[in-house]
Amino acid sequence: ELITQEQEQEIWQIIAQALRVERLARQDKIATDMMRTSQVKMLLGNSGEVEINDFGVKFWLDVTKVMFSSGNVTERHRIGNIDMSGEIIVDAFAGIGYYTLPMLVRSNAQHVYACEINPNSIKALQNGAKLNNVEKRLTILEGDNLSTMQQVYSLADRVHLGILPSSKKTWQSAINCLKPSGGKLHIHMNVEEEKIEDFVTYCSDSIAKLAKQLGREGIVSVEHVEKVKWYAPRIRHIVIDISVK
């Protein structure tokens, strides 16, 4: 109320010039809705469309509509360093392609089936795939993943479950997506630091129990536990790599 809108724009112009940028925006907390809608507000400029180059992978998004999860950078790089040559992958929570694109570009996955419900994220993923020239190796399954994953039962060598705070609701579907010979699961969870060891055991036992119930009993083993970041005081974002044979 102390300055006019014109004066405010002049201030943003000065700041933009000092930073050598063309646009400015304000980042508020990510919405808590199912879509995790972006709360970015443009201060200078009208378009929120950006391209991000991370670890040799190009991402596209409109920052006013979807978020870019910068805190998971180490995990994106780790996944991108895994050799997935010849593998069929199901990404149960694809978003804008945080892990889908590294798996296609860096890991050399043969094909990724990406499940996503948010139209804005799907647009971003499609554009990102084109930027990386991998659109022919990507199939987007739009809608609720508990339904769309049924389209790829018994096809996958690997299933990625990258959602927080818990991916538990998709564990059964993920097992069903694995080939009859088995495969690997990447399970993201938020866990209290002092309970990580117990939770890893619980997770492994639960996957083994579900596999048996589904008539897919086999050898279930934990291959790796990655501590990605602190999510909150005492709460870790972890990824459990599980092999099902």
Whereabouts are the PLM-identified features?
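SAM-dependent transferase fold signal centered on methyltransferase-like domains
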Residues: E1-K245
